[in-house]
């Protein structure tokens, strides 16, 4: 299991313990990007081991040299595509954030809707590709901008690696994952199409104008 660095995805850690207790579930191991809530799950025995390549708060920093079964790993062990034993390829679930998601489930975490560089991908594309289930958690809109849109500015993580998009206005499942659709139906969890989420976002904040690009190439992804 892993969560990304975005607020919504990190917040998922805060709500895990209740559901794990109710269902008698224990997590074998977690990787990341580790923060305090995941460390607490480790200390309470809800997680078998934590193996991290970076820490997001002081609780995680202190834990790595104080808590048994909290281990450090290198970036090569974490996500080197030439390493057959990379940890990202062993993930069951990853919960990640997004600046934009489009109707093909492509995700942008690099550039804003204005094309300006806003962040860094980190392990976003690696964990999405390697995990059995990639869940994107994001608000439908940010201010006056639609998060779910027709086409993202920059494809950081391709849509065929993204399985579920969770927003404050509904859940969309990638049609490439009929098994997940069946699971949600069986559990009585409502879901909608990604296109309907886009239209809802546009109805709230309007349809954005297309970006106008100049000829100079500043980066290739």
Briefly describe each language-model feature range:
Residues 3, 10-20, 24-28, 37-221:
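Conserved phosphate- and dinucleotide-binding cores of soluble alpha/beta proteins
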């Amino acid at each position: 299991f892993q969560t990304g660095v975005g607020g919504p995805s990190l917040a998922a850690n805060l709500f895990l313990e209740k559901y794990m207790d109710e269902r008698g579930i224990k997590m074998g191991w977690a990787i990341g990007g580790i923060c305090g809530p995941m460390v607490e799950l480790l200390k309470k025995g809800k997680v078998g081991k934590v193996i991290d390549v970076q820490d997001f708060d002081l609780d995680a920093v202190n834990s790595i040299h104080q808590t048994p079964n909290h281990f450090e790993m290198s970036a090569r062990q974490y996500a080197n595509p030439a390493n057959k034993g990379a940890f990202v390829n062993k993930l069951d679930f990853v919960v990640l954030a997004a600046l934009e998601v489009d109707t093909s489930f492509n995700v942008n975490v690099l550039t804003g809707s204005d094309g300006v560089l806003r962040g860094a991908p980190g392990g976003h594309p690696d964990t999405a590709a390697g995990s059995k289930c990639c869940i994107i958690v994001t608000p439908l809109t940010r201010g006056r901008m639609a998060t779910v849109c027709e086409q993202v500015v920059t494809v950081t993580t391709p849509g065929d690696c993204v399985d579920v998009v969770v927003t404050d206005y509904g859940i969309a499942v990638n049609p490439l994952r009929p098994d997940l659709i069946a699971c949600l139906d069986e559990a009585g969890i409502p879901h909608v199409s990604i296109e309907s989420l886009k239209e809802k976002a546009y109805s709230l904040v309007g349809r954005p104008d297309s970006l106008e690009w100049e000829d100079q190439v500043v980066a290739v992804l």
